A protein has these predicted regions:
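Conserved GNAT acetyl-CoA-binding A-motif
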Residues: 101-112
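Conserved N-terminal entry element of GNAT/NAT acetyltransferase domains
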Residues: 1-12
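Conserved beta-strand-loop-alpha-helix junction that forms the acyl-donor binding cleft
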Residues: 110-121, 139-142
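Conserved small/polar residues in nucleotide/adenosyl-binding loops
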Residues: 145-151
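Conserved active-site alpha-helix within GNAT-family acetyltransferase domains
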Residues: 115-134
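A short, internal acetyl-CoA/4′-phosphopantetheine-binding micro-motif in the GNAT/acyltransferase core
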Residues: 77-84, 114
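Conserved acetyl-CoA pyrophosphate-binding loop and the N-cap/start of the following alpha-helix
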Residues: 83, 87-95
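Conserved beta-strand in the GNAT
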Residues: 51, 57-65, 73, 78
Length: 155
């Protein structure tokens, strides 16, 4: 059974998963171009964070950053290595979409990298209904095409 816990950054397994996520993204991105948030960055009031557990094992996590009253951005979406390649990424995305709807978010966006490392994430986001869009919020278009900016509208 899938269990969701909001804001449990201090759980050692969640902390380790996020730490690994930060390291991987920084290593896979051109220097100075990452927009990944560390744990203090995820703890700000405009961000909600959830970890998802399957039979008491950490499956993954993700966050929703409020850009304004009805526009949210997904951040720090990561599936635990033990749950990868088993269609669990879609469970994390679907959970975040449900939470966003509960919070009256009408538009969702995701920023992700354009390199080979990010191809599985782009495939997951595209399969979830996200489509490319121009840069949003504080993001800028960059010459090395680091950003892919999909957006979906919630009805």
């Amino acid at each position: 059974m899938l269990k969701s816990i909001e804001g449990n950054f201090d759980h050692p397994e969640v902390n380790e998963l996020l730490r690994k996520h930060f390291i991987e993204l920084r290593e896979a991105s051109p220097k100075g171009s990452t927009h990944v948030l560390d744990i203090p960055g995820l703890k700000i009031p405009s961000i909600k964070f959830w970890s998802l557990w399957e039979n008491d094992k950490l499956m993954g996590c993700g966050a929703l950053k409020f850009l304004n009253n009805d526009h949210g951005e997904f951040k720090s979406i990561r599936v635990h290595d033990d749950f990868r390649n088993k269609k669990n990424g879609i469970k994390v995305i679907n959970h975040l979409i449900i939470e966003a709807k509960k919070l009256k978010v009408k538009k969702l966006s995701i920023e992700t990298g354009a390199g080979k490392f990010f191809a599985p994430a782009r495939k997951l986001f595209n399969s979830s209904g996200f489509k490319p869009c121009p840069p949003f919020a504080h993001y800028k278009a960059v010459s090395y095409t680091h950003l892919t900016l999909p957006t979906i509208l919630l009805v």
